[in-house]
Amino acid sequence: MQNLYSKFNSLINKKKTLLGVGPMSLNVIDSSIELSDFYKAPIMLIASRRQIDSSIYGGGYVNNWSTSQYSKYVRKKTKSGNIYLARDHGGPWQNNLDIKNKISEKDAMLSAKKSFENDIDNDFNFIHIDTSIDIHKKINLHSNMNDEKSS
């Protein structure tokens, strides 16, 4: 962890951009790895749970990969070691299976926890926790917050 922190601190001090790429397809993943290796530049592959997820949650739409398959592929393919795996929008109800089955809040939290554990076990470097979805509650995004306070 200290090594990772030192690398990113160095990039920040050099005012270098850290590019994050959504792994939308095998071509995007391979191209990102190729560019990272060629230019010796760090690139984060930032996968949502819909793109890549644990096999117990049906994997993801990218190559039908589970978290483990995805991590193994990327780690084997990269030569420079400058590819960082990141989870984007990890959290409850962030995969299609949880939404389709309309699972309870408790089960959604357990699903997110197991997915995060799988990310950690498969060498993900960054995890974005997103708790913004609640399929059981309707939120009016167009309401004025001041109107709600006065009610």
Segments (PLM) and residue ranges:
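Helix-rich catalytic cores of soluble enzyme domains
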Residues: G91-S151
